[in-house]
Amino acid sequence: MAEWIAGGLEGPAGRGLDERVVRSGTTTVGLIASDHVILAADKRATAGFLIASRRVKKIVMLSNYVAMTVSGLVADAQILSDVLREEIRLYEMTNKVKPSVRFVASLLSNILFSSKFFPYIVQLIVGGYDTQPRLYTLDLFGSITEDKYTATGSGSPIAYGVLEERYREDLSVEEAIKVATTAIRSAVLRDAASGDGADVVVIGPQGYEEKFIPYNSLV
């Protein structure tokens, strides 16, 4: 996860945004396969050169059909996930129907964009299933892209190499999980801010399933 490093406070609205102040950790990946969305994320949180935790959950269930992976500042990610959960509940109570995954991602994009001069330091993946599997990537300014596969965090350049090589649209769910965990493992081997196994969430027409895969069992 991201950590604050001693340094100046240069940047918009006085918040430190240059590389001397903020460093990002984490590896999270998402992909669509066989009418499902697969999300995976490592378990390590860092504070400077210290491993602050080996048991962090970086995949947040926003409802029973949509989830979000987080990389960046822990506090920023927590407040955003809390806001989104409550907005989804409010929408369901008001409209008697669940909001689409696109609606959730667009709402998050609007929240991030509205704070662009005092931004949330996060990079996020939103994935879920409404009438079909959906996968979106968002940066700290609210830019949003829809993808078949994606990765975020400091280990993402390494993870992308695996995804580019192994992703196919006809992957089964089990094959997609192996691709995702292989991408996480490859990043963990080279990125000091990622490690300690992976959480995996699979979301499809019948709901969602979560599981933890220890590092030694990552493909």
Swiss-Prot record:
Species this protein is from: Aeropyrum pernix (strain ATCC 700893 / DSM 11879 / JCM 9820 / NBRC 100138 / K1)
Keywords for this entry?
A: Autocatalytic cleavage, Cytoplasm, Hydrolase, Protease, Proteasome, Threonine protease, Zymogen
Q: Provide the catalytic activity annotation.
A: Cleavage of peptide bonds with very broad specificity
Q: Which GO terms describe its cellular component?
A: cytoplasm; proteasome core complex, beta-subunit complex
General function of this protein: Component of the proteasome core, a large protease complex with broad specificity involved in protein degradation.
Q: What is this protein called?
A: Proteasome subunit beta 2
What SUPFAM superfamilies does its record include?
N-terminal nucleophile aminohydrolases (Ntn hydrolases) (SSF56235)
Disulfide bonding pattern of the chain: none
Protein's UniProt keywords contain Lyase:
no
- Entry annotated with the keyword rRNA processing: no
- Chief location of this protein within or outside the cell: cytoplasm
Q: Which InterPro entries match?
A: Ntn_hydrolases_N, Pept_T1A_Psome_bsu_arc, Pept_T1A_subB, Proteasome_sua/b, Proteasome_suB-type
Cite the record's note on assembly.
The 20S proteasome core is composed of 14 alpha and 14 beta subunits that assemble into four stacked heptameric rings, resulting in a barrel-shaped structure. The two inner rings, each composed of seven catalytic beta subunits, are sandwiched by two outer rings, each composed of seven alpha subunits. The catalytic chamber with the active sites is on the inside of the barrel. Has a gated structure, the ends of the cylinder being occluded by the N-termini of the alpha-subunits. Is capped at one or both ends by the proteasome regulatory ATPase, PAN.
Q: How is its activity regulated?
A: The formation of the proteasomal ATPase PAN-20S proteasome complex, via the docking of the C-termini of PAN into the intersubunit pockets in the alpha-rings, triggers opening of the gate for substrate entry. Interconversion between the open-gate and close-gate conformations leads to a dynamic regulation of the 20S proteasome proteolysis activity.
